[in-house]
Amino acid sequence: MSKRIGKSLVVNGATLVTEAAWNAELEAKHEKLVEFLNANKLAGVLIRRNENVAWLTGGAVELRVLTPCETGVATLLVTAAGKRYYFTTENEAPRLHDEEFGALDFEPVLFPWWADDTNAAAAKLAGGPLGSDTPGAGLTPVSLAPLRLALGDAEIARYRWLGAQTAAATVEALNKVEPGMSEYDLEAITAAALLRRGILPSVYLFAVDDRILKYKHAVARGNRLERYAMLNLCSRKWGLAISITRFVHFGALPAELAERFRAAAQVNAALLNATRVGATSADLFAVAQAAYAAQGFPGEERFHHQGGPTGYGEREWIATPAGAEVVVNNQAFAWNPSIRGGKVEDTVLLRNGVIENLTSTPDLPALEAKVKGSEYVAAGVLVK
């Protein structure tokens, strides 16, 4: 169970983020956003997207009511003069005041539910041109993704907890998988393990047997498990996203499939070893391409993207042949190399030249791979 006590974040009775750390996080993000506004000659910015709301508020504010929706029940306004507002309807106001914005320095602006006039009211308060992270008449489109990429200490503390708990939930579900279960059953037991921890599933690609080999994105279709199951998921809490994939096989793992996992782990190791400050998206794509060829699977990179940085998006960008995006310090990554039914995927953090696995599952079989003298560990298949 997690909750705010004052401005501290307490999880299961332990303080995860102190009030001082949270205050520092909020102030740093506010300053960064005001600098962004001044650099872009904007009087203010409207923030509606859930990932940006979570980023700006240090994971404190949850505006999501409709789960699949990218926006919630309020809009934030930050002005170049440093003022902060949230716009919402009168029916949402009591909960937002009590449970979301009570510890934050945001001024509410309220409307009847049938007469939301956020854009006009925001323009008047800002007194000049407005940017927005969602389209709108008279608004300048802006992306806040570049501001989100480098994670601060408080974000890393939350991320470590989320990674460890998502990994634990995944292993809990994996150990409950039995032949005869449907793909929907696999989704249900995994969702239960996550939701009990206060974690929201955001991507579900669960499949069994030949569907794993045939499809890279195999959404559940109700097939019943005979021998081989894949739990491929993303989870969210405090706006942060975790990616993890794990497998279980009943009976001896076929040698051909075991070889594909070994090769995928080697590609993963090559990507992790190359994930260093200053590396570009194109550099990393080339590393994956060369690694597949070196493992005897040339061209395998064509069949699916290889992953990229994560954080407040399941992928903030993905590695592409001409990608110009650049790796920064304190950035999270989720690489997902795969070879026809064999795949490895974890969420890791690059911090001061060191790769930290946030979703380690030491109770599962391990695949060790070395690149240029450095060893990297990926999860193998649980064989029952």
Question: Whereabouts are the PLM-identified features?
Answer:
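Active-site neighborhoods and metal-handling regions in enzymes and metal-associated proteins
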Residues: M1-K384
